[in-house]
Amino acid sequence: VAESLTGGLVAAEITSVPGASKVFRGSVTAYATELKHRLLGVDATLLAERGAVDPQVAAQMAAGVRKALEADWGIATTGVAGPDPQDGQPVGTVFVAVDGPLAPETGATRGGKTTALRLNGDRAEIRRESVRSVLALLLEQIAGEQTGNERAQDTERNGGF
């Protein structure tokens, strides 16, 4: 997990579930722009030209944390929770991203997606909805790895979803 505007809330949500230690490797809260480059490998030119609130920044944060933590999946949040605009972006502008494992047969990334959000509400509401949105995107990407038949078999084997 790589977090900016959510400041650790995504990691807190994941680790609130018993047994999370079996699947959760860790998180990086890169609130300061320069940490996005230094810790997560986000392109410095991209940050200088577009700022931290950008879809490519979110995608690079997700890929960077996946690599840094040697995880199968990386997720990231970046955006403007308010009360003031940032990097020319209005309050409520959020980008969430997922970066998934490589397909063994092709070496291509299987799960990779960035979503732009325009959220309303106060700072706390924007941050909460950002957490919900990035976790929903991760679930969507993980579920998309399975074909319909595999998913049906998994549901039967495990007694439901």
Predicted regions and their residues:
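Short alpha-helical segments enriched in small residues
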Residues: 1-161
